């Protein structure tokens, strides 16, 4: 009996230790920008993914499957991010994607001179559900949702709020499919929390990971995982190819 107890302890200890970590992944959407790859809606015209963008999203999904990801996927409400997340999810994810407006793109950057505002030039709730039926829209989410004239500092604040909320009110690993501009806010915020992530170009479907100690909410490791799955011929920054 003692041997059985010892055996169980030896098995459960590493499992318990592993459970004390959780990883937040942030991915940019796939390649977009070709005027031929656009979709017109009631209040806006949205970029859809270019052929390489679709391949990038598929590569992202295949990699997330290899990681054994079993957490929750959040996605920005833009068409290009919804499309990226939906394509990637086919490889590894069976639950609904959760819409998260706090990870939407930054529109004003440092040059914003007017007060931040909300514009109707965005997808409606009905349009999102019609085009992406696997997306869950939180009941508290307000429409319209798209911000205009937002400074980087305000974007940093909403990302900080999002990370705090997810750390406090969710469990398990997280994947957030968002945008190149807002990923800069993510990096700045994560560096405040213990990472030392370099400022660099955020390629289409880049994937950055930040692992937290669940007990302290401190970052214990971080990585750019893009090169683990992205072929060299698929490195793009929208219309710029490398």
What are these regions (language model features)?
Residues 4-15:
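Sec-dependent N-terminal signal peptides
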Residues 20-22, 105-126, 188-242:
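Acidic, low-complexity terminal tails and accessory targeting/binding regions
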Residues 21-100, 152:
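Active-site-proximal alpha-helix that buttresses catalytic centers in soluble enzyme cores
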Residues 24, 171-177, 195:
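Residue-level preference for the first positions of well-ordered beta-strands
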Residues 43, 141-156:
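Surface-exposed cleft-lining segments at the edges of enzyme active sites
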Residues 67-69, 166-173:
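Glycine-rich phosphate-binding loop signature in dinucleotide/nucleotide-binding domains
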Residues 70-102, 129-142, 211-242:
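Conserved histidine-centered catalytic loops in small-molecule metabolism enzymes
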Residues 75-76, 157, 177-178:
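Short beta-strand scaffold positions
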């Amino acid at each position: 009996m003692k041997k059985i107890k010892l055996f169980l302890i030896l098995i459960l200890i590493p499992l318990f230790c592993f459970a004390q970590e959780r990883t937040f992944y942030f991915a940019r959407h796939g390649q977009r920008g070709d005027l031929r790859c656009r979709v017109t809606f009631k209040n806006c015209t949205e970029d859809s993914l270019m052929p390489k963008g679709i391949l990038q999203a598929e590569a992202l999904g295949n990699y997330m499957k290899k990681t054994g990801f079993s957490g929750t996927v959040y996605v920005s409400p833009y068409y290009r991010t919804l499309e990226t997340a939906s394509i990637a999810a086919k490889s590894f994810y069976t639950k609904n994607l959760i819409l998260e407006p706090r990870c939407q793109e930054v529109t004003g950057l440092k040059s914003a001179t007017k007060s931040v505002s909300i514009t109707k030039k965005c997808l409606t709730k009905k349009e999102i559900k019609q085009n992406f039926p696997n997306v869950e829209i939180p009941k508290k989410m307000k429409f319209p949702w798209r911000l205009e004239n937002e400074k980087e500092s305000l974007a940093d604040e909403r990302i900080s709020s999002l990370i705090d909320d997810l750390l406090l009110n969710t469990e398990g690993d997280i994947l957030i499919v968002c945008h190149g501009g807002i990923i800069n806010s993510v990096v700045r915020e994560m560096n405040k929390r213990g990472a030392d992530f370099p400022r660099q170009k955020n390629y289409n479907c880049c994937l950055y990971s930040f692992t937290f100690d669940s007990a302290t909410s401190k970052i214990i490791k971080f990585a750019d995982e893009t090169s683990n799955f992205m072929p060299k011929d698929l490195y793009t920054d929208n219309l710029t190819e490398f």
